Each structure stands twice: as structure tokens, then as C-alpha cells.
Amino acid sequence: TTRRLTAFERQRVLRRISASMAERKEEFARTLAQEAGKPIKGARTEVERAIFTFNVAAEESTRSYGEVLPLDWQEFTAGRWGIVRRFPLGPVAGITPFNFPITLVAHKVAPAIAAGCPMVLKPAPQTPLCSLLLAECVQQAGWPDGGLNVIPLSNEDAGLLVSDDRIKLISFTGSVPVGWDIKRRAGKKKVVLELGGNAAVIVHSDADLSYAVDRCVTGGFAYAG
């Protein structure tokens, strides 16, 4: 199972995933552009970011340190030491949005692998194909069977993941109302929420207005080509 893999084995898997994605990066980029409608230039940049994310996770997979604590602050524990170790939490559910269909998926999958946790991934209904391509890379890299399950579901059916007691942590990226509803319904599960977006633009009176206009137009419409 995933929890029995050593740190160096998890690191090796993550590096293989990154290498496999790099070999297929044009396939990823074109799939992303076709299913999400993102311009190919932006799609290629996003794929590079996802590849980088798996490389970072590979490095971090060997840095999950514990602690050794002296217990000599009471007489009867003098000469004794406490050891703190970290263990995989268990099955994780990842729920991702449509706007960055490989980067935000990588942000869920890579840390789960680094920590030794199996994942059930629900990609956005509009953009499941990049996640399925990634699952191929993960399987070919040697991650145990069943360690990553990509399940294209409707948003309504995703509630089954929230209520399933086998899931120990839910990682959600999406809207504020849905995120807080997940937290409310999650019970004792741990929840990680990345909600909404604060994309305000402030142009000061002494700014270069030509530059500001160019950046505002780019930021507002880049996704549309």
C-alpha cells in the first residue's frame, strides 16, 4: 500500500511522474487547450508549472522530519527521550476547478504522493481529460494500484466524497459557498480550502497608464486568447 513506501520510493515515483509529464508535455498542453479553451501558450506554461510542482514534491517527500524531545523536565522522566514520528493520514479526496485543470490537480496529487496518502480525485466536470492523462503517468511511475483514483463526477455527486467516512482529508479548490458547505458537512475530517479569488486592480495616479491598461487587458482576457 502507499503508506508502506519509504520516503526515497515516494521521491522516485514523483520524479518519474515529472519526467513522464515532460516527455508528454505537448500532449498535455493540447489536451488542456482543447478541453478548457485556454490559449496554447498559456496551456504550455501551465503544464510546465505542473511538472515543476512534482519536482518540488519529490524534494519535500524526504523532508517530513520528526522530533526527538528531552523529557527531563520531571524527576521521574530524567534521562528519557520522546520521539515524534509522522505517518500518512490516510485516503484524501481532492476536488479541483476548471480554470487550471492540470496545475491545481498537481497541487492536490503531488503532496498526497509525497506524504504516502492514496487519493480520490474529482476533477471539474468540464475538464477531466488532463487528470486522466496524469493518472496514466502516475500509474506508469510505479505508484501502487488504487493509489490514485480519478473519478469524473457531477458536482452534486461529489457530496458522496464529503460524507464517506473512509476519507480522512478533503482538499477543495473552488467557490466560497461550496467550500464552507464542505467544511460544515465534513464532520471530523480534516479540510483544506482554497476559495475564491481576490483579483482587484489598483492603478495609482502616478502610474504608467499605458502599461497599466495593457496589463489589465491581459489579465482580464488572457484566458480567452
Question: Which residues does each predicted region cover?
Answer:
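Conserved small-residue-rich beta-alpha loop and adjacent elements
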Residues: 70-144
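ALDH superfamily catalytic-core signature
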Residues: 169, 177-225
